[in-house]
């Protein structure tokens, strides 16, 4: 029996790790492949524990570095200002100059390039499994080096993504005008030289990353051709969850030929639960100590603080508002909270307990199929609610105004706090209105998700095809290999 071939799985962040687990488990079960998780950076402690428990191989490419980013527990804390020496001030100023930043970025990416090359030399993979091909760093370095060797790459995005949301995220940064905007002549010059690295949102042209970063990345062939699109780099194929996802990426400029509709592997388990939702609901409600006959509201707690979209004090204020509204629904309606992998359970648990709310330890794909109403921010989890015909309230009190769900008749977007309670009551108490929303989700479901429980198998078949194609290309002389790659990967 041949030795299973290595598949390198680069999740990019802990949330992506959770989404990749279904595929990795299926790869191991097939016996044909040996998946290896690549953890690059910090935040993967829980992921490493899961790997050890399930016997999954993983590799740490570099030691996690301490972060100065504020944590939830720091919100509102008062820090005593420290006096800085003149030498410290001068050093800080020098670090901000373009030439120094360019040199630092060049050496940083040189080290990344070296790590990527060592991974490929040591592990000799048959394919790469990624969540994108545009994240400058190990992701784009692996894709470029793999393309040179004829090693295929498969992108499986797990989150909603478009250029507008990426721009809104940058516009929320305190110093966005100098960092990403056109205030500095360097930024303007780079956009003139490479218009594809810029994007205009609300009349403001933004650079994907600061000038030093994109220029250094371009030198090392790590800069994606179209960074504002999740699949805008040099990966071979992208497997998306639905017709909506495919249309969305094509609208952003991706090639139709690069995209295939496979469904979302994480939803395979959800599809089975949905088919047996009565029994599944009774089981979980018994575990939580709540009545399964009462209506069940599931809330994916927004992560505006975790994603730096709000200061932590404002994030907690928003969270407390939602919790207080949910508390008022008790005991006539059951409420269960679902936390994002980036969220710290210890920070949320006391607040939830104060309002008498349950935080589920189960993942969202176990909760949404058994719910009656789903509340979330703009989240990819909403697509599962569409697939399961569950009415949704999207809370957008800060008017991010993404247009992901504007045309879905089973989703209500609430942009004003004062309308949230009345909207909830309307859904929970007006059965005719509730049924309208259910019917709206049912009509949208075929366009938004492939919910047949076969997505993982389609992904495995696709990986098999790519591995075979890669083996054929690697038989060619090195100079001919690149010509046989997809046009966007050459």
Predicted regions and their residues:
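C-terminal amphipathic helix plus adjacent low-complexity
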Residues: 302, 417-490
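Active-site and donor-binding regions of nucleotide-sugar-utilizing enzymes
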Residues: 8-28, 38-54, 60-269
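Catalytic binding pocket for nucleotide-activated donors in carbohydrate/polymer assembly enzymes
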Residues: 349-353, 380-450
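A generic structural motif
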Residues: 29-37, 330-335, 357
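Donor nucleotide-activated moiety binding/catalytic core segment of transferases
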Residues: 113-114, 120, 336-388
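Structural motif
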Residues: 6, 126-127, 237, 296, ...
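A donor-sugar binding/catalytic signature common to diverse glycosyltransferases
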Residues: 163, 240, 245, 250, ...
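Conserved catalytic-core segment of nucleotide-activated headgroup transferases in glycan assembly
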Residues: 20, 26, 259, 265-347
């Amino acid at each position: 029996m041949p030795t299973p071939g290595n598949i390198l799985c680069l999740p990019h962040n802990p949330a992506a790790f959770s989404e990749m687990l279904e595929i990795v488990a299926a790869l191991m079960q097939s016996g044909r492949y040996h998946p290896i998780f690549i953890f690059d950076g910090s935040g993967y402690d829980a992921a490493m524990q899961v790997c050890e428990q399930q016997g999954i191989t993983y590799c740490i490419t570099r030691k996690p570095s301490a972060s100065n980013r504020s944590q939830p527990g720091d919100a509102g804390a008062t820090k005593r200002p420290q006096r800085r020496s003149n030498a410290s001030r001068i050093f800080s100023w020098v670090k901000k100059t373009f030439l120094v930043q360019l040199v630092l970025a060049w050496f940083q990416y040189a080290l990344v390039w070296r790590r990527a090359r060592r991974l490929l030399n040591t592990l000799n993979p048959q394919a790469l499994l990624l969540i994108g091909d545009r994240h400058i760093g190990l992701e784009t370095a692996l894709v470029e080096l793999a393309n040179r060797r004829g090693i295929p790459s498969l992108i499986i995005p797990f989150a909603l993504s478009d250029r507008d949301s990426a721009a809104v995220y940058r516009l929320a940064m305190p110093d966005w005008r100098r960092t990403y905007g056109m205030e500095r002549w360097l930024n303007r010059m780079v956009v003139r030289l490479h218009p594809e690295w810029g994007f205009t949102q609300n009349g403001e042209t933004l650079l994907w990353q600061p000038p030093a970063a994109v220029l250094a990345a371009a030198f090392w062939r790590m800069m994606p051709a179209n960074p504002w699109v999740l699949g805008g780099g040099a990966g071979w194929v992208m497997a998306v969850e639905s017709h909506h996802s495919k249309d969305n990426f094509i609208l952003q400029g991706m090639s139709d030929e690069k995209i295939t509709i496979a469904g979302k592997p994480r939803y395979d388990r959800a599809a089975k639960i949905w088919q047996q939702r009565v029994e599944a609901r009774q089981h979980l409600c018994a575990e939580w100590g709540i009545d399964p006959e009462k209506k069940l509201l599931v809330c994916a707690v927004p992560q505006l603080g975790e994603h730096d979209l709000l200061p932590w004090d404002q994030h907690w204020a928003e969270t407390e508002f939602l919790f207080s509204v949910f508390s008022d629904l008790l005991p006539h309606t059951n409420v269960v909270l679902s936390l994002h992998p980036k969220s710290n359970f210890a920070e949320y648990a006391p607040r939830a307990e104060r309002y008498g709310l349950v935080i589920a330890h189960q993942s969202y794909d176990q909760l949404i199929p058994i719910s009656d109403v789903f509340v979330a921010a703009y989240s990819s989890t909403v697509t599962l609610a569409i697939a399961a015909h569950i009415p949704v309230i999207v809370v957008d009190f800060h008017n991010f105004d993404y247009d992901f769900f504007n045309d879905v008749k089973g989703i209500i977007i609430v942009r004003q706090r004062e309308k949230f309670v009345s909207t909830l009551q309307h859904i929970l108490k007006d059965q005719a209105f509730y049924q309208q929303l259910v019917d709206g989700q049912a009509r949208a479901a075929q366009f938004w998700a492939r919910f047949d429980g076969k997505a993982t198998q389609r992904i495995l078949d696709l990986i098999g095809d790519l591995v075979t194609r890669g083996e054929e290309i690697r038989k060619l002389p090195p100079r001919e290999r690149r010509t046989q790659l997809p046009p966007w990967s050459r």
